[in-house]
Amino acid sequence: MAEVKDHFAGRIAENYDQSSAWMFAPEVVEPTVDFLAELAGDGAALELAIGTGRVALPLRQRGVRVAGIDLSTDMVAQLRKKPGAEDIEVTIGDSASAAVAGTFTLAYLVWNGIMNLTSQDAQVACFQNVARHLQPGGCFVVVVNMPDLQRLPRGEKFRPFHIGSTHLGFDEYDVANQGLVSHHYRLRDEGWKASSMPFRYVWPAELDLMAQLAGMRPRERWSDWTREPFTSESEKLVGVWEKRT
């Protein structure tokens, strides 16, 4: 399996909370934490790609014991600056292979984190790694955007996802290989700076099969944290898989 690259180092980590401020809003975070706390129950939770603690810190404040995995030492350094971070143990590594002490009633990977693993093998390995950490009956939650292929004109591979005065974003699709590269152009003091991040998009049925290979079964499938039904028009999947007993 290919080495996973840290795409969140340096300035990206330093500016992450500010550039993603809308994701930290109470109306976004609270339904997320409600959903996860319910599944965790009296047990502990493991967050894959814990980042700067957007979800882990408020979940810990709810009384859920939380551990985390993240590849980016710089993102974890930002987490460590925040109140309550001392209660969260973080292992540096990728979601497909990093090992954490103990077992958990809940593991979760939100905000397209599964897509940061850019091969099918790595995504399958992620499910298998989670299964090793879950107690029997424990749940794995994956949140991922649905591929926006319906809006991609035939023969085209680029689609803009954000046009602003200081940021331009374009997705580049490789439909044959389920590949996606997000290209960012950000206006800095020294001028426009370009960066790109690769992803591998996934479909719900494919995730179900990955879970099956890891000894899990589907439990819930929603379009958001408030348990709205998942349909063909849904832009996001909130999937829950349960480790077989």
Predicted regions and their residues:
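Conserved class I S-adenosyl-L-methionine
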Residues: 1-51
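Class I SAM-dependent methyltransferase SAM/SAH-binding core
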Residues: 52-98
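A short acidic, Gly/Pro-enriched loop at the edge of an enzyme's catalytic core
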Residues: 99-106
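A conserved beta-strand element that flanks and buttresses the S-adenosyl-L-methionine
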Residues: 108-110
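A short glycine-rich, Lys/Arg-flanked "PGG" loop and its adjoining helix->strand segment in the class I
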Residues: 124-136
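SAM-dependent methyltransferase
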Residues: 141-210
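C-terminal lobe and adjacent flexible extensions of AdoMet/dcAdoMet transferase-like proteins
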Residues: 206-245
